[in-house]
Design a protein with these regions (language model features):
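Conserved catalytic cores of soluble enzyme domains
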Residues: 61-179
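Intrinsically disordered, low-complexity segments enriched in small/flexible residues
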Residues: 1-2, 10-12, 171-202
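Glycine-rich anion/phosphate-binding loops
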Residues: 1-5, 30-45
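Extended interfacial segments that mediate partner engagement and assembly in macromolecular machines
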Residues: 1-17, 23-28
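Glycine-rich phosphate- or other oxyanion-binding loops that anchor nucleotides, phosphorylated ligands
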Residues: 19, 33, 39, 57, ...
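A structural preference for short, pocket-lining loop segments at secondary-structure junctions
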Residues: 11-22, 39-63
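Short small-residue beta-strand/loop micro-motif enriched in glycine and branched aliphatics
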Residues: 28-31, 64
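Short glycine-rich loop/turn motifs
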Residues: 4-8, 52-53, 90
Length: 202
């Protein structure tokens, strides 16, 4: 019974208050139009007003082109909203799901302080066949997968969905300097690479 592909929620992840958003691919392919843009901007404003991190789970093929320039305008509007979040020194974590493509990738989804991605998910702007026809050469079989994108520096860490809660809360604990919520032994056992990620985001 959704009237928008984007869902915004507030809550806690292991005791850390967050504002979170996600795109439902079942709603017109997760495309972003006027309502979705407003929802994302609302989520960012809620995070700013309540001084919480913003965690987003993108999934979709891009802008809703039957809404024409209104949909495209939301690439700019959501980007400006994320910039306001960063001005307030609030963490913005993106967790890529399958697929994330088009104008979603070309705007707010690629602006995270840290980028997580689920294994094997598609992360792209234009499709593989379009690019292959343009560059006139064969592309690798893993082209535009999360593993390929990680290898080229656009994803920081590939994480199974079942492990996202732990990874997100540990990283936020470090970024927010909530020392009492962080167990050093747990960090070392759970993620050897969490410290470099925290440094990259700070």
């Amino acid at each position: 019974n959704q009237n928008s592909a984007v869902m915004i929620a507030k809550g806690r992840i292991n005791g850390i208050e967050v504002t979170a958003g996600a795109i439902n691919f079942e709603f017109i392919g997760g495309s972003v139009g006027a309502a979705e843009g407003e929802a994302i901007i609302y989520g960012v404003q809620h995070a700013i007003d309540n001084q919480t991190p913003f965690v987003f789970f993108p999934c979709g093929g891009g802008q809703r082109m039957f809404e024409s320039p209104i949909a495209l305008a939301n690439m700019t509007r959501t980007t400006l909203a994320i910039n306001e979040l960063k001005k307030n020194n609030l963490p913005y974590l993106v967790c890529f799901t399958d697929p994330t493509a088009g104008g979603i990738t070309a705007s707010f989804a690629m602006l995270g302080d840290i980028h997580f991605a689920e294994p094997g998910c598609l992360i792209a702007f234009a499709g593989k066949r379009v690019i292959q026809a343009t560059v006139k050469e064969e592309l690798s079989s893993d082209f535009q997968t999360s593993e390929f994108v990680e290898k080229h520096g656009f994803v920081d860490r590939i994480v199974e969905r079942k492990d996202l809660k732990t990874e997100i809360s540990l990283l936020l604990s470090i970024l927010l300097k909530k020392d009492n919520a962080v167990n050093e032994k747990q960090i070392n056992e759970t993620s050897d690479n969490i410290e470099p990620l925290a440094k990259a985001a700070s």
